């Protein structure tokens, strides 16, 4: 894996998420008690979770309301043992980096 700059500081509003494409992966970065990165792909019907509503560590897919933990990637309802990939995030002087 390698660290890649994905965003500028302040680009992702507190309490919100934003989708980014990097190395052919669609990644959602959430700014909720720090930055958290997970695959931006709901396993239900491949919708983007980045614009979903955040409540604590849980994001709700805006298409059909499935819920994922933004820190662990774990699906919180409907199917057991389903997780989206998570990625380490670092905030540096020149921006936000993800280990892809």
Place the predicted regions along the sequence by residue.
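Short cysteine/histidine-rich metal-coordination sites, predominantly Zn2+-binding motifs
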Residues: 56-62, 76-84
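N-terminal pre-ligand scaffold of iron-sulfur
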Residues: 1-56, 70, 83-100
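Short cysteine clusters
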Residues: 42, 61-64
């Amino acid at each position: 894996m390698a660290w890649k700059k994905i965003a500028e500081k302040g680009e992702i509003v507190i309490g919100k998420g934003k989708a980014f494409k990097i190395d052919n992966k669609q990644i959602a970065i959430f700014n909720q008690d720090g930055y958290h990165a997970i695959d931006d792909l709901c396993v239900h019907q491949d919708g983007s979770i980045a614009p979903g509503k955040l409540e604590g560590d849980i994001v709700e897919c805006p298409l059909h309301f499935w819920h994922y933990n933004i820190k662990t990637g774990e699906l919180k309802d409907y199917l057991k043992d389903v997780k989206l990939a998570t990625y380490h995030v670092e905030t540096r002087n020149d921006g936000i980096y993800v280990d892809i």
